[in-house]
Amino acid sequence: SDVYKRQVHKKGSVLVNRSYTQTVGDKEIRVSIPEEYYTEIYNYLNHIGKGKMSSEAQRYLDEGKIKSFTATKDIVKNYRYCCDHYFLHLPITINFKAKSDVAVNERTLAYIAKKEDIHIIGIDRGERNLLYISVVDVHGNIREQRSFNIVNGYDYQQKLKDREKSRDAARKNWEEIEKIKELKEGYLSMVIHYIAQLVVKYNAVVAMEDLNYGFKTGRFKVERQVYQKFETMLIEKLHYLVFKDREVCEEGGVLRGYQLTYIPESLKKVGKQCGFIFYVPAGYTSKIDPTTGFVNLFSFKNLTNRESRQDFVGKFDEIRYDRDKKMFEFSFDYNNYIKKGTILASTKWKVYTNGTRLKRIVVNGKYTSQSMEVELTDAMEKMLQRAGIEYHDGKDLKGQIVEKGIEAEIIDIFRLTVQMRNSRSESEDREYDRLISPVLNDKGEFFDTATADKTLPQDADANGAYCIALKGLYEVKQIKENWKENEQFPRNKLVQDNKTWFDFMQKKRYL
């Protein structure tokens, strides 16, 4: 048949596994064997080519990660496509008489306004995670959070990384491009299925990053194109959500599916809502203290001369040593500094030299991928001791700092103090992604993902998903407060600027 190009493992050929099981923490995951080493091993065992392997490929054999068997008959991949068949296809159009997509949005608003037990699923692309979700209730409590680097035991982050190492070569190899495309779509399909289950389990709406509102770029593991594909697939999944394990006429069965979205003409025309999906601006989500709402808005780029540095230090209310906490305290009012045009709900803050921070190592005037750990209080003490400044009495140190001319060193310590996200490069430690706050919260604690329990975000990417969920919660609360039967809902109530977000977060309006 010409229907499908046969890919056959001939009888007598040796088949080799493409992945192996590895224990990580308390989980077993499937780790892919890089394509180049798999090909070497396959050719070697089937006596194809030179009969030699690289040391890297040999290591997989020596460590027992390779399982092989000899085919006792011809094995044809996707055999069902190799034969001619007739298929009787009878399409059914659900909601054939529906006149408008608008009803989906309006009925969603009514559902949210009337439903007591509702949750919000925040979805975020991460710097260290392909996708991260956080499920919160109407009081902002985390009910569930997880990364989607590993799905069904497979480390897809590593798998995609391995596949795309040969991206340049892949551009010339359409078969390899097709494999990467299929891998991404297969991954997204599994993630979307999981999210769809959560929507039904928690009576949840979905909050996700608005692609048309300052879409974040930079060091993210899911690029814009793939994220748009994810968004499209999620809309299509929730447009008519059915579960195969339910009876045909049961709620959620094939004839009584959940219609939770509508299919838009294009993503750009969706606006801020597509049924159960709400789009929120993602600004100030991952690098914000989830317990106090503190965020670093300082700009250090223009502190290029002593005059500007003296002015910066002089604007602090106090710089002093706190003997009880055994840390240094910087107190300030954000109104005295440039705030990137942002209006805060709380402007007066006290930050402390709490814990350690990562500082990237500079070689020949350029930043490297390596970092060093700086113990803030210890570094501050040594700096003041070298300058001959006494600090144990707890008095304000600003005058002596300027007098001794160490403003640059103090500002460097302060910059690290308000640097909340601290991530090592992948070459150092791919798992190290710590968020640590310099501000005491209501419990008298400094938020730190290294010590936070499961009721709080577990890393910086988790914090991004959590805060996106909280932005979704803001909209849920606005709907509950302003929706009225048989009246047009005022859509302007769902607009969120930075001022609104900081007020909601810093004043804990969600409690």
What does each of the following model-derived ranges do?
Residues 10, 23, 47-49, 138, ...:
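Intrinsically disordered, low-complexity segments enriched in small/polar residues
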Residues 24-30, 42-46, 448-457:
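Charged, low-complexity surface segments at secondary-structure and domain boundaries
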Residues 29, 35-81:
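Short amphipathic beta-strand and strand-loop transition segments with alternating hydrophobic
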Residues 76, 84-511:
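Positively charged, helix-rich recognition surfaces that bind polyanionic ligands
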